[in-house]
Every structure is written in C-alpha cells, then in structure tokens.
Amino acid sequence: MCIRDSLVRGVQDVCEKYGYSVLVVNSDDIQEKESSYLKLLYSRRVDGVILTTAGYREEEEFPKEELLLLKKMNIVLIDREINGMTTPIVKVNNFGGAYSAVKYLLAMGHKKIMYLAGIKKTKTNQEREKGYLTALREVQINWKNELAADFRLDTAFQKIVQYWSQLKNSDDLPTAIFSANDLMAIGALKAFAQLKLRVPEDISIIGFDNISFSDCTYPPLTTIAQPTYLMGQKAVETLLKVINKQKIKKSIELETELIERDSVGRWKVSR
C-alpha cells in the first residue's frame, strides 16, 4: 500500500489533538527496510506504531525475530493482516469494493472481464478476487480470466504486454480489466499504450485504491476509493485505546466508493 498524504494527514490530525507527535517512515514495500525501521522504532521506545506491512510477502508471514518485536510494541495495522497475531486492524471492505467494480463493468455492457490479480495468498487479494467472482456468478457469466501479478506497476505492464502479444486478435481477449490495485491498472494503461490499443474504446480498466495520481493518468483512471483519511483517524483512535488498555474492536471495516473517470467505456461490439 502506498503511503498516502490523506492517510498520514488523518493520523497527524488526531495525534496533534491528543498531544502526540508523529514520525513517518516509508518501507517502499521492501521487507528489509520494514524490518530495519521496526527495530529503530522499538529502540526509540515509541508509544505505538501504525503499520501497513510490506505488501510483497507470499503469505503475509513475518520472520520470528520480527514477529517477537511486534508483540513487544503497541501496534495497529492498516489494510494488511499478519498471520500469527491478533493485532487490531483498520481496513476496507475489499470484497464489497471489488464486487461493486465488477458490477459497474457489467452495467457498462462488458461480459469478458479479466481480473488482474495481486499476490495470490494475501488476504487483500483473496477478498477482492471473491468479489470479482461473486459479481460474475450472480449474472451467470461463465467467462472469467485471471492474470496473476504482484501489485506492482512494472510486473503488470510486462504481464499485459506478454498476454496480449500472444493472443493478439483472438476472440477470447477480455473487453475490460478489474485490477486489484491502481498501480497495476496504471501498468496496464502503459502496456496498452505500447500495444496501440485505446482505453476505453478497445479495452476498459478499473482500479482499486484511488491513489493520489490516479486522476493524472491518460485517460484518468476509474477506480474504487478507500477512505484513507478516515482510516488514519480510526487507526490513531484505536491505538490510543491500546496504549491506555481500553476495550477495542479488533477489526474496523470501512466502505469503499466508486470513482467514475474516463478509463471505462460502454461496450457496444459483440465478440
């Protein structure tokens, strides 16, 4: 998950209200950097940590040393769970967001919708995949296809170019893509530009996250927005309860919102 200005702002606003200062560190989704920063935060005896774990772990599992360190600190997670811990988490309804994305594509006339997947074993990806499959199943569409990537822009770009180059003008190509995150959706936009395919005339794309530059792409990306400012606020409120040993909800799930831009078009041609 990219660190987003609105999420950090939500954290800062609540912390300032209660007299806490904020130290922000960014792992760039690199596990080694994450481990190093956690050791640094522990050594500085911070009151608590709001953590979005590095996203490219196959099974969202931590090395034992890192897991022991986490258990010594006051922790609240955002977005990604950790196996082996009952840590409180603030997340979004990933199933519901994915479901609404695919229902939107269906309403726009698309019947061949590909799922551009993240890391298969992560809970985030699994919930979004379930939403995709459920939306198709409800309208009895048997055509489904999944292209596995890893949440990264460059990987999605390479996978799309390879897939479309192999099938070329096949009737089995999708007319729309639901991407498990915006970075991969942007990688797909880049790939289709190279393949000289028009978005949304030839292929439609919808992402998930509404990252800060998703409206700066060409065309601007239609996506599912996470309420990141509210997530930051809820994470701090929960962390303060953890610090003060008050009763907490172990999981806070927030709803998503469809943001309509220009990367999805109505499908008019029957394949």
Language-model features, listed with the residues they occupy:
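Short acidic/polar active-site loop segments enriched in Thr and Asp
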Residues: D47, K111-K112, T175
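Flexible loop/turn connectors
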Residues: K144, V161, S165-R271
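Hinge/beta->alpha junction and helix N-cap segments in small-molecule ligand-binding domains
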Residues: R4-S6, V24-K33, G55-E58, R80, ...
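Alpha-helical recognition/docking segments in bacterial nutrient-uptake
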Residues: I3-K103, A107
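Short beta-strand segments enriched in small/hydrophobic residues
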Residues: I50, K112-G118
